[in-house]
Amino acid sequence: MVPLVPREHMLRQFFHEVVSGCYPTYTGLDDSEVTTYIADLLTEFTASENLYRIRDASGKPLREIGEMLTASDPVLGSAPSFDAEREMRRHIGDFALFSTGMYPESMHMRRNPLDADFMEMVRTGKESYYIVSQFDLFEYKQEAPFFARLSEEFERCMYGLTKVREELDRLGAPKMLM
């Protein structure tokens, strides 16, 4: 994901403070790599072009997880390579984590009855991070264990995001980003 918000921007710093305060306290995850990743994810997902980054063949943003999964298939979908599949799966994991952690109620408001429910979204997020972790050669070797951790700790990370949302609500942040 190409950062749209500069590293030194106050919004990024704000999310880093909130996430690094909530995660160790409520989840027991005192892992700066995880909290940095989550805070950066929140920052970048404030831009809808990052939240709905996967596109169909005509360039239309895909908003449903099922459509994203189909697109990520390098044989049957629109992913032109296994590298593109990895990047799409990373995004699917990020999207699932964000959706289930920050906006679990959005799972009940889905317009398409064929789209994933809450538990399916959790399973898809974990599976997507696991698939990303299996790209463990060459340029991906160093970050593969991190995505394995995200897969294993998905529910704790999701719970941490619910606590982040509670903290944002307490501070008077806007209610809906999705």
Show which residues each predicted segment covers.
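Polar/charged low-complexity regulatory segments
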Residues: 1-177
